[in-house]
């Protein structure tokens, strides 16, 4: 089993992430941001990752630091669980619909952080959650997991549906990319010999 636990403590947040990449989708989430917990649940369930996240942040100011630092810590945990990246598929992609919404996520465990985020949300907030924080979450993740990530919402009228399809597709693409390829066991999936 590929397991990792990462603790991140700053003056703004205290976050603990524990992940099992070879899990069954079990989750225990307590970030203090209910909508973020809902989205993290999508990652765990659709990625089949066992995921525990506990966060304490400066929510009296706003959700920004908690959301961003959760992305950072999750990225660190995924990178730690994968290790040297030998034998992983490396690339993953997924399309996910939800009623009128459709999103595509493509990921590459290249070792080169990069984010292309194209989601034209139809409103600025989902309940009390600022939709701009989703890009901060994913930026934190890519910078600390060392991945290239393309996120495109292809259509959607309901912002909740747009967001949910993005996180579901991300979980499924992440699962695909981190799976072990039996035919490439022990090999780095790159002609360079390293990632």
UniProtKB/Swiss-Prot annotation:
Record localization: Cytoplasm
Record-listed E.C. numbers: 4.2.1.19
Chain segments annotated as transmembrane: none
Keyword Amino-acid biosynthesis appears in the UniProt entry: yes
GO molecular function, one term: imidazoleglycerol-phosphate dehydratase activity
Family, per entry: Belongs to the imidazoleglycerol-phosphate dehydratase family.
Name the UniProt record assigns to this protein: Imidazoleglycerol-phosphate dehydratase
Organism: Paraburkholderia phytofirmans (strain DSM 17436 / LMG 22146 / PsJN)
